[in-house]
């Protein structure tokens, strides 16, 4: 981490203030987990890199509530920050992907998913690498759909931040596209996207109309059992589950877009009339949870 002195300083300055982390700062916990990883699982780059990067998002998402410091969404935030660092380290793509998966999922309830070996190993390290006044054995359970056994069509749910490449991918698929952005743009063809979005956001009746149009299109494609692509951010488990519940006969696949944040930022600045605020990105980064097969996905592809 010598290449990132500013990040290390932030980790040293970020205190846990938690009964689950009485060892002190994020940096102290990171060092404890990394030391355990190198001794218990030597020459394991996935666990070593995950140990170094799993909590870097805590430096940016922490807030005080009821006298306690909370880091809600740090797993997702850490995942996106880690992409560029792993690229700087020239980490091979297969190892990079496994690290990103493990970072994103290191806070989920492992008893309810088919967790990978690295994820189970890292959970052990994460729990051992701290000083706790109260033991935390696991985390909140997740809610999944029950996949149908009789599928007639495929729904590809795209997952990623704005400007990560989802819409371009959807357009090249040649399939019907379910997109809230497209509905908003079609309502105001003479407006820029930002103008159209702000117009809709300022009027509850227009927001309701957009939702109605979205539901109508979704219902139509579900009823006709057509292959389609859902082009929205879909960063959270709940947002994906909401879509999946509307297709009774579909097989689901996910396509996850994880380009470096520098690429996303450059694309965001280069799109005339469509600039996504930083606060929106931060919110979506915090909501991000890596899709897993247990959610009901038959396959998951990654575009890094």
Indicate residue ranges for each PLM-predicted region.
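Pre-Walker A (Motif I) flank of P-loop NTPase domains
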Residues: 150-156, 225-226
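Acidic/His-rich, divalent-metal-binding segments that scaffold phosphate/diphosphate chemistry
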Residues: 1-64
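Glycine-rich phosphate-binding loop used to anchor ATP phosphates in small-molecule kinases
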Residues: 204-252, 256
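Glycine-rich phosphate-binding P-loop
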Residues: 155-173
């Amino acid at each position: 981490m010598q290449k990132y002195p500013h990040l290390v300083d932030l980790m040293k300055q970020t205190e846990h203030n938690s009964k689950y982390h009485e060892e002190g700062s994020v940096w102290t916990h990171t060092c404890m987990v990394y030391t355990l990883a190198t001794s218990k699982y030597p020459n394991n780059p996935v666990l070593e890199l995950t140990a170094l990067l799993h909590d870097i998002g805590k430096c940016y998402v922490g807030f005080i509530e009821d006298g306690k410091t909370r880091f809600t969404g740090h797993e997702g935030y850490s995942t996106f920050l880690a992409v560029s660092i792993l690229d700087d380290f020239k980490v091979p793509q297969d190892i990079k992907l496994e690290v990103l998966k493990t970072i994103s999922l290191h806070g989920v309830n492992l008893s309810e998913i088919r967790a990978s070996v690295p994820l189970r190993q890292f959970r052990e390290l994460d729990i051992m690498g701290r000083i706790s006044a109260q033991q935390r054995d696991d985390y909140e359970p997740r809610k999944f759909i029950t996949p149908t056994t009789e599928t007639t069509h495929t729904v590809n749910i795209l997952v990623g931040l704005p400007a990560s490449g989802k819409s371009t991918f959807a357009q090249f698929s040649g399939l019907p596209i379910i997109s809230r952005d497209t509905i908003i743009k079609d309502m105001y063809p003479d407006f820029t996207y930002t103008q159209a979005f702000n117009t809709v956001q300022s009027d509850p009746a227009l927001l309701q109309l957009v939702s109605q149009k979205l539901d109508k299109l979704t219902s139509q494609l579900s009823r006709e059992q057509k292959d389609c692509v859902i082009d929205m951010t879909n960063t959270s488990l709940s947002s994906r589950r909401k879509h999946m519940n509307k297709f009774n006969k579909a097989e689901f696949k996910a396509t996850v877009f994880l380009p470096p944040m520098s690429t996303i930022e450059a694309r965001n600045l280069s799109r005339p009339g469509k600039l996504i605020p930083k606060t929106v990105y931060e919110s979506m980064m915090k909501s991000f949870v890596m899709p897993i097969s247990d959610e009901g996905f038959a396959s998951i592809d990654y575009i890094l």
